[in-house]
Amino acid sequence: MVGSRHPDQCAKRWHHSLDPNVKRGPWTMEEDSSLLEAVQKIGRDWKEIGRELFPSRSTTDIKNRYVILSRRRGPSPAIPENCSSIDIETHSSSLADSKPPIPAELLTPEVDFSIANTPCELDSSNLAPDTLSINMTLPSDLPSYLSLPLPDTAETDHALDESSTAWEIPDWTAFDNQCLFTPGASELEGSFTSRNHEEPPQPLPVPDIPGPSTLVLEDLRPETVNLVIDTLLRTNSKFGMRMYNTGS
């Protein structure tokens, strides 16, 4: 008669929903108590419990009722084999909540916080070179070229123009000692005042010699050479320079 259904489906449908002899009404408190006691004695053999105590109820109804009662009473210490997924989740969350708190000494290692109030003494020998403050004096014959002052064209209003500065090699064979005026390093340094005092520099004493002059400077420090170049630029002098190393 029902060709689209399997015989097992028809039997289950009849037994669980259509059989008038199967009780489908609400459970009473006496039935709930009897069901819980039967599970404690017999176990979760729903067919056996149904034959002995609830012949008018289906095994599926008995099982579902026990799951509902278990959820109301709270999770049992052990997870049932035939328990639903809802019961398993409830049981797991209850076990997680019932775990004792982990001692703090297991989470955080013991630390003596009094060390934070103790002055820290560093050994400078273990520090990196760039973290030390070294106060040392360089030899006088080894000047620091990075700290040498260069002529400030913004203050002197003179720019070093390559077209007006001829880097020529003079004819040393025509050198005349009588027209040579070479002031010493102390005279050059004494004729200038540091720019920190904001005083105008004094001109160098130049002999009154007509015609071109040749100036030879030997064994000068780099800062002295800078002072000479600055003076020539200030006076708008046309000059040629040749720097060479005579060797030691």
From Swiss-Prot:
InterPro entries, A to Z: Homeodomain-like_sf (IPR009057), Myb_dom (IPR017930), MYB_TF (IPR050560), SANT/Myb (IPR001005)
GO cellular component, one term: nucleus
Pfam families: Myb_DNA-binding
Record-annotated HTH myb-type domain positions: 19-74
Keyword list, A-Z: DNA-binding, Nucleus, Transcription, Transcription regulation
Keyword Transcription regulation on entry: yes
Biotech and industrial use: Cichorine and its derivatives are promising in the course of developing novel herbicides.
GO BP term (any one): cichorine biosynthetic process
Effect of loss of the gene: Abolishes the production of cichorine.
Subcellular location(s) per record: Nucleus
Primary location recorded for the protein, binned into one broad class: nucleus
DNA-binding region(s) from the entry: 46-70
SMART domains associated with the record: SANT
Compositional bias of kind Basic and acidic residues: 1-22
Record-annotated membrane-spanning stretches: none
Molecular function GO terms recorded: DNA-binding transcription factor activity, RNA polymerase II-specific; RNA polymerase II cis-regulatory region sequence-specific DNA binding
Functional note: Transcription factor that regulates the expression of the gene cluster that mediates the biosynthesis of cichorine, a phytotoxin active against knapweed, corn, and soybeans.
Alphabetized PANTHER family for the sequence: MYB PROTEIN-RELATED, MYB-LIKE DOMAIN-CONTAINING PROTEIN-RELATED
Protein name in the entry: Transcription factor cicD
Lineage: Eukaryota, Fungi, Dikarya, Ascomycota, Pezizomycotina
Gene field: cicD
